[in-house]
């Protein structure tokens, strides 16, 4: 069965969104959604539109871990977001270690000559691409 997977990089102010191809081989950037986690605005209205558009079978959330592998407050917040997302949309939610993905995304943008102002707009969705691509690579179908 061919189906897409959404990848999310969830922060306190934005959610970077990526999507896989139907074969589950590559991740592409979609957009960055502004949120306000402290006010309870989680971006679910916009995510609902994207879920209807892409019809994913699953959503992969980045799981922020400490360098020693321990989970802290941000990982707990990510898991809480995932639980709310699963309850809201009835989709399976998986988690992918996101250590260093934002740093990798920033390096890619800097190496590509992207100006600081533009990097700020793109970094979260590129981090979402890296999170999803890492997940796809780790769960690749053995053909």
Swiss-Prot record:
Pfam families: RuvX (PF03652). One of its GO terms (molecular function) is nuclease activity. It is found in: Cytoplasm. One of its GO terms (biological process) is rRNA 5'-end processing. InterPro entries: RNaseH-like_sf, YqgF, YqgF/RNaseH-like_dom, YqgF/RNaseH-like_dom_sf. Could be a nuclease involved in processing of the 5'-end of pre-16S rRNA. This is Putative pre-16S rRNA nuclease.
């Amino acid at each position: 069965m061919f189906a897409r997977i959404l990848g999310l990089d969830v922060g306190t102010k934005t959610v970077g969104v990526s999507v896989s191809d139907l074969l589950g081989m590559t991740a592409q950037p979609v957009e960055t959604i502004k949120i306000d986690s402290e006010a309870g605005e989680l971006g679910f209205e916009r995510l609902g539109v994207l879920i209807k558009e892409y019809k994913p079978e699953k959503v992969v959330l980045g799981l922020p871990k400490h360098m020693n592998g321990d989970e802290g407050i941000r990982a707990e917040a990510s898991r809480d977001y995932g639980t709310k997302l699963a309850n809201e949309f009835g989709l399976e939610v998986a988690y992918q270690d996101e250590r260093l993905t934002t740093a990798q995304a920033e390096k890619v943008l800097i190496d590509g000559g992207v100006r600081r102002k533009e990097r700020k707009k793109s970094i979260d969705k590129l981090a979402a691409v890296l999170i999803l691509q890492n997940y796809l690579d780790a769960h690749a179908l053995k053909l």
